């Protein structure tokens, strides 16, 4: 009797730890994806579609039918280029609407973290501005 109670408590704690680890993993994953999109944006010519594809597929021109990393799609990525051609030229890459499912049956449902964004100054990549 006591061992079944302890086993249930252990399983609840274990699944809770796994869910927390999953949240941390996806937080880091999305943070790194927007960072890589911002890095791509500052060293290449500005192309919002290519930047969104780098974030979602890790490739500026993915093959047709390619699925995004962990369900991420280019439509979840927004790219903003502000103050173009000035010293305060910035690129903002943002991911919104990403949905993840919990492992735990008690937290069944969809969790939408974020939004995640990264802003980077455009350096010009050696081009005259």
Please place each PLM-identified region on the residue numbering.
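Alpha-helical assembly-interface signal, strongest on the long, hydrophobic N-terminal helix that forms
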Residues: 1-57
